[in-house]
A protein has these predicted regions:
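Short alpha-helix capping/helix-loop boundary micro-motifs
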Residues: 39-44
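C-terminal structural segments of small proteins and small subunits
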Residues: 56-90
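Pocket-edge structural micro-motifs
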Residues: 28-29, 45, 59
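N-terminal first-folded block
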Residues: 1-35
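Short, flexible, glycine/charge-rich loop motifs used to bind or transfer phosphoryl groups or to couple energy/partner
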Residues: 15, 45, 69
Length: 90
């Protein structure tokens, strides 16, 4: 899993049938300090996240499929939560 920020969405008028009705988000991975790290990833939105939201992303394909209830569909990453706060102090 990783924490990221939604930086945009991707519109696909044609896509795999099992992905019909899903939203595709562009997510910028963040480090624990909230700084950008790595390259932007594409993830299916499972929680109705929006631009600027900090989100929790699962990148294991099988886990993403299970969380979204998409069975054997071609899912690589999924947004599974909106992050309210990160507490590094414990």
């Amino acid at each position: 899993m990783l924490i990221g920020r939604v930086v945009g969405n991707l519109v696909a008028t044609q896509k795999y049938a099992k992905l019909e009705g899903t939203r595709l988000l562009l997510v910028q991975p963040l480090d624990l300090a909230g700084k950008d790290r790595g390259t932007t990833i594409l993830a299916i939105d499972g929680v109705d996240a929006g631009p600027g939201d900090r989100v929790l992303v699962v990148q294991d394909g099988r886990a993403a499929q299970l969380v979204l209830g998409k069975g054997t569909s071609a899912v690589d990453a999924a947004v599974v939560g909106v992050v309210d706060a990160v507490d590094l102090q414990g």
